[in-house]
């Protein structure tokens, strides 16, 4: 995530490198 909600997998900064469906 972009430092917001946790995605499906543990995201490391920068998170935006991993395109993941973020629940909004």
UniProtKB/Swiss-Prot annotation:
One Gene Ontology cellular component: extracellular region
Pfam families registered for this protein in UniProt: Toxin_33 (PF08121)
Subcellular location: Secreted
Keywords noted in UniProt: Disulfide bond, Ion channel impairing toxin, Neurotoxin, Postsynaptic neurotoxin, Secreted, Toxin
The keyword Disulfide bond is assigned to this record: yes
InterPro entries linked: Toxin_33 (IPR012637)
GO molecular function terms attached to this record: acetylcholine receptor inhibitor activity; ion channel regulator activity; toxin activity
Organ and tissue specificity: Expressed by the venom gland.
Disulfide links within the chain: 11-15
Job of this protein: Waglerin-2 selectively blocks the epsilon subunit of muscle nicotinic acetylcholine receptor (nAChR). Also has effects on rodent ionotropic GABA(A) receptors (GABR), since it potentiates I(GABA) in some neurons and depresses I(GABA) in others. In mice, it elicits tachypnea, ocular proptosis, rapid collapse and spasms, whereas no toxic effects on respiration and blood pressure are observed in rats.
Similarity-based family: Belongs to the waglerin family.
Summary of subunit composition and partner proteins: Monomer.
Protein name in the entry: Waglerin-4
Species assigned in the record: Tropidolaemus wagleri
